[in-house]
Amino acid sequence: MPRTAYTPSLPGLSTTDDLDTIINWGLGADSTAYLARMLTDPDAHGIDLKRTAVLYMATGSEWPETRLLVEEFMLPLLREHGVRFVQLSRSGHLKADGITVLDDSRHPETLFARGPWTLWDELESVGTVPQQAGARKCSLRAKGDVGDRWIAPTMGGRPFRQVMGFNADEEGRRFTDIIASKIPGRRGVYPLIDWGWDRQQCKDYLWKRFGVHWPKSYCVFCCFPVSMGALPAHLERMRSHPDIAGEVLRLEYTAMSLNPKAKLYGKRTLLELFDPSQPRDRACLEAFERELHMPWALYHVRRLFLLSSSGERRPVMRSTERVDLGRARQLGQRLISVSERHGIEVEHDPVYGRARSWVRRRRETWPMAEELFTTAPARVINKQDKNFEPAWDALTSGSTAQLPLT
């Protein structure tokens, strides 16, 4: 798989010279309904398929049923009409790693689930979960930025249309997209909004067309179902895939081990939403327990909550260091024993095994520092923000880690 986007080098010899339309396809009901309807009569919708590319960005954590529906109903449709289908992903954690073209074909046979690097890889390696507050940075990072990095060199500044699958209830996203657009020559097109099609109309169209209920497309660990009022449906999806639920529970549990505030749904955790007395919920919890049967690590975590020169809150700085590797129970007993001997506050989760010792708790007001030792599944890497140590020394006068664990 090529790791960078194809860029035309000889005008007149490239398949992209006449490209004038890009269709963003997120696999969900909205953009799929547009694509399926448009293909019934491309000319009537102002689309020249010879000059069009459908763009899909693989995040790596799409629900299995979405992938199956795409391969059963939509890929045959793309092949029938000879639609150019470009599948992309990030190549690595850093922007400098570039993007990977997973496939670029007018006869696509497979929907690629992931590329060399995924959002899950990123979240798991740093021990965090998506944040509910603010912009959907994870989507921009794994989708928007990836697509833009293919489009910009491919189009080379030529005028083109980019079709976005926002439904009629998402008028605000149209204005946000127009404002955020930075690619030279780009003009956003929003057909579902123009048609007045809301999400239900899109789902109804796909039901009539294919005889299936087309689910919403999003990552299995997405934090937004609760804010969209779709949490019950999301939990049902989890119950249908207990192994996936177990993995997401481990992701959240690890993140909360390093930061108790890292709950998947703001003030609520995924774990608390499962009732062990219910058989289908219990299956998810049992899958979670199996996920925890792996090497664990003892981590030293420090955070800085600093203010700028103008008094505004700066992004939180963090240092995460793996101190030891072993079994959950062994590491937990060690941390509890040492903490109690030194009079340090310690917490223990007897059900799933985490132990956490607070050397320094955060205060209520900024600036402040936080320091703790915790046990967690050994998936988190050593990572420290730039200039962390001098900033830590400046705020704390160098005091750190009074537990003899390192």
Where are the model-predicted features located?
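Nucleotide-activated chemistry modules centered on ATP-dependent adenylation/adenylyltransferase
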Residues: 1-406
